[in-house]
Amino acid sequence: MQTFHKDNLFSLKQSRGLRVSFSARSAFTLVEILVVISILAILTVITITSINFALSSDLTRGASRQVQSYLAGARDRAIYAKEPRGVRFILDPANPTAVTSMIYIAPSPNWEQGIIRLERTDADSNSVADSASVFYVRGDGTDWASLASRDLIKQGSRIKIPGDDSGTWYVIDVDGSGVSGGTELLRLTVPYRDPGTSDPTEVIAFTPGSGPSTYLLELPPVILSGEEPTLLPNNTGIDLDRSFLPASWRPPIDSTHVSRGGDSQPGKAGVDDDSSGGADDNGELLWPGTDDYRLYSSQLDLMFSPRGSVLGSEAGSGKIHFVLDTLENIQSSWLRTTDYAEGDRVQLPARLAYAFTPYDRVYVCKTGGTSAGNPAVFLITGTRNEGDIVADGSVRWETQLNATPSLLTLFTRTGSVNAYPMYFDFAGNVPPDVFKYAETGEAAK
């Protein structure tokens, strides 16, 4: 048995004192708990934001890889089959400015029914030609009206005259043509190569027994047998308004090719958007900050030749830049005189000088309120630095880099498809050179 000693008594007192001291600090104070909760809340918000951003970026990169693979597949099919093959981009039913699925296509047989004759312009129908140039092709038994009613004669369609090996292909001016009812008249975008054999004042360009009577009319491609549409990853799409598209894909700004949106008026209903002295005129169609939107064709087709290059008018620009983004971002264009809440996110409207190109900044609402009427506040060089605050009516926006979209570039002369990051230009450069990496071949540092 251990001998009791006064030192033992001292040690016992010390240990009891320590236990008392420890037991007195066994819980947090209310202030400490509130501080911890606040820190955890801040960390949670930061973490969730980072996760959402990472997930969005992963989604668009996955969509970019899928489109890249699909285009490469169409090119390979054309080379292997030694016949043109292509891809049809299918619009999203709920968002007509986004593509959310694709399908493989092949060319249709050329249409050659009936016979034709060539005519000069006679705008006032007085049987005297307005000029010696031969612009019109009149059909007899061609059934072009039936084709037009099925949307098979489209802007950019071509006709070969005559229809044999000596013929030349011409682009059809669909808007200037008359193909309805009993009228079967196509207008060429350029005059026919031969001025005709009749007097230049005659409407019919060739005398009987001379001139071409055969033709080949190019029809839109058809879906390959057995193919089903391939969907892009959920919540992603090709942003047509912000992609650098072929001219033949870009709808003209008129009442036929622009939807007036929910208010059924050009621009913002009841507002003189363009300061022209009147509200709701056609000059305000597709005005920045309004709910108007472009009406794209239901047949956005890219065809590859057996050599691997892109065929048709779509090849004219040399390159096509596809912008893949989340559907939320695609639909988040800034609107004038609209209420916004904290956390809302907007993009610069893809209108006027900023049509068919992405913008390298986005804006997150930090103070809710009502927006003003001019998107130019987002273009001031002093508000393009990351973290800058943009004053827009009673709304305050924070500038952030637009890092969610992915870029995919198709080089039409070679058929190669490459993915590139979007270039975040310097704050002082407006408009920004967002396609710098894609067009110079540089990689992001």
Predicted regions and their residues:
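Tryptophan-rich substrate-binding surfaces of secreted polymer-degrading and adhesive proteins
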Residues: S332-Q400
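N-terminal single-pass transmembrane signal-anchor helix
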Residues: S23-N52, Y70
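Residue-level "contact hotspot" at macromolecular interaction interfaces
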Residues: S23, S149-L152, D339
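N-terminal helix-rich module
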Residues: Q2-F10, F28, I46-T49, F53-Q68, ...
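A cross-taxa feature marking solvent-exposed loop/turn segments within ectodomains of secreted
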Residues: A41, Y80-K82, P358
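Exposed loop/turn and edge beta-strand positions of beta-sandwich/beta-sheet ligand-binding modules
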Residues: I33, S298, Y359
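Conserved polar catalytic motif of the HATPase_c/GHKL fold
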Residues: G73
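N-terminal secretory signal peptides that target proteins for export/translocation
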Residues: M1-S23
